[in-house]
UniProtKB/Swiss-Prot annotation:
Residues the record lists as binding Zn(2+) 2: C93, C96, C99, C107
Source organism of this protein record: Legionella pneumophila subsp. pneumophila (strain Philadelphia 1 / ATCC 33152 / DSM 7513)
The protein's name in its UniProt record: L-threonine 3-dehydrogenase
Keywords: Cytoplasm, Metal-binding, NAD, Oxidoreductase, Zinc
Pathway(s): Amino-acid degradation; L-threonine degradation via oxydo-reductase pathway; glycine from L-threonine: step 1/2
Catalytic activity: L-threonine + NAD(+) = (2S)-2-amino-3-oxobutanoate + NADH + H(+)
EC number: 1.1.1.103
Amino acid sequence: MKSLVKAKKEPGIWMQDIPVPEYGVNDVLIKIKRTAICGTDIHIYSWDEWAQATIPVPMTVGHEFYGEIVEVGKEVQGLKVGQRVSGEGHITCGFCRNCRAGKRHLCRNTLGVGVNRPGCFAEYLALPATNVIALPDNITEEQAAILDPFGNAAHCALAFDVVGEDVLITGAGPIGIMAAAIVRHIGARHVVITDVNDHRLELARQMGVSRAVNVKYQKLSDVANELGMLEGFDVGLEMSGNPMALNDMMKAMNHGGHVALLGIPPQETPIDWNQVIFKGLVIKGIYGREMFETWYKMIAMLQSGLNISPVITHNFPVDEYQHAFQIMASGQSGKVILNW
């Protein structure tokens, strides 16, 4: 089958012909229809320090997908050939304390599809049935292909009560933009998103934010004053991994505010802990998606009218994957989809 493989320990991704994956009695085999390129895939393509320390070579990459079931393991229940599906890309052990307590997103033994085990940038993917999400008919193929990152956004955006609250989002990448759409959809008052990338800030405006702020040219404090906010932001969603953005967020928070951290800093990051302690801030780290409550909620939000389509900016046939990766890496895009 056709696949995109990290075949060498150097920058790049290579298209190769590899065997169709075998599947076990508790697995399903999925015919891949659409995939989306993630920031993780760009790290792997670039072969940065994280990728060098994490990715076994060779490795079929990719973890954001839409497809249809073509084979079902003999012990699988509740799924059948022909169903439209996406899937959870974190494979958990099922036996640790958190897994047994129903908190699989906190499994210490997690393996990542397209990271530690073969991924979805291929014509077929074998996946444990427990990780497969059967899709309602009113979820489109494009929406299904980005449910994984949409789930990151939902997990973060729903970490704290945002109804009637003023929300600050630092980082207007695709996940930050989708988080902005979510908090607006569920009842936040003012939603402010910051970045230094004007292209992505414009995408955020299309998603209905109150203000999209380029912090190179405008101060957050001025924006808050213009919106009539006298006491700071109630909820902060840090999506950028930028140390300066994180500290700007701490300064902008109201006393007793809540901060969810999804962005990953590139190095050890100094924080002004006086902002945290004397303001009584609550900080929560966010990783992946809650299994599977986040999946239920994000599909329900799409069914109830949440529109995330503006974040999908490019579609390419898989044979044009090199150009697709370049577009995604440029920062001048939202989500980039490969059609198989």
